[in-house]
């Protein structure tokens, strides 16, 4: 899911992968129901879930079915831009918003580009 080890390597066109370089895998995030490896984060429930528990919880009724779940990176366990809405066959890749700000008042030629992930409200 992540870009890999090479800075020059570009992400796949379907996007949504981790923006950082995943050179060191982090400690796996645990599912809050079964204690397995979590693969999604539900913002509405504020819960990390594995695929099996996610299907069970969000298949319970039509209200839970509409929750947007963020997919975790398989290497670094950070949230990616890939989201699940409803069925696991329906993936959404959130756009990112780039803001440009000047670093100093004296040196106006230097600018920082900050990329902020889009989040559903």
Curated annotation (Swiss-Prot):
UniProt zinc finger (B box-type) residues = 26-72
Motif interval(s): PFVFL: 117-121
Any one Gene Ontology biological process term? regulation of DNA-templated transcription
**UniProt GO molecular function:** DNA-binding transcription factor activity; protein-macromolecule adaptor activity; transcription cis-regulatory region binding; zinc ion binding
Transmembrane spans: none
Zinc-finger recorded as keyword? yes
Quote the SMART domains the UniProt record gives.
BBOX
Its induction, per UniProt?
Circadian-regulation. Peak of expression toward the end of the dark period in both long day and short day photoperiods.
| GO CC terms | nucleus
Tissues showing expression: Highly expressed in shoot apical meristems and in vascular tissues of leaves. Also detected in petioles.
Superkingdom, taxonomy of origin: Eukaryota
Keywords (A to Z) from UniProt: Metal-binding, Zinc, Zinc-finger
Write out the function statement from the record. Answer: Developmental regulator acting by forming heterodimeric complexes, that sequester CO and CO-like (COL) proteins into non-functional complexes. Involved in the CO-mediated long-day flowering-promotion pathway. Engages CO and the transcriptional repressor TPL in a tripartite complex.
Q: PANTHER family this protein is in?
A: B-BOX DOMAIN PROTEIN 30-RELATED, ZINC FINGER PROTEIN CONSTANS-LIKE 10
Protein name listed in UniProt: B-box domain protein 31
Name of the gene encoding the protein in the UniProt record:
MIP1B
């Amino acid at each position: 899911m992540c870009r890999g080890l090479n800075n020059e390597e570009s992400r796949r066109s379907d996007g949504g992968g981790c923006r950082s370089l995943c050179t060191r895998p982090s400690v796996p995030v645990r599912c809050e129901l079964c204690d397995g490896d979590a693969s999604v984060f539900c913002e509405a429930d504020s819960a990390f879930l594995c695929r099996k528990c996610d299907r069970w919880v969000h298949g319970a009724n039509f209200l839970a079915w509409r929750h947007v779940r963020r997919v975790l990176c398989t290497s670094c366990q950070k949230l990616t831009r890939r989201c699940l809405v409803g069925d696991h066959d329906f993936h959404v890749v959130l756009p990112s918003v780039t803001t440009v700000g000047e670093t100093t008042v004296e040196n106006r030629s230097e600018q920082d580009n900050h990329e902020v992930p889009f989040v559903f409200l």
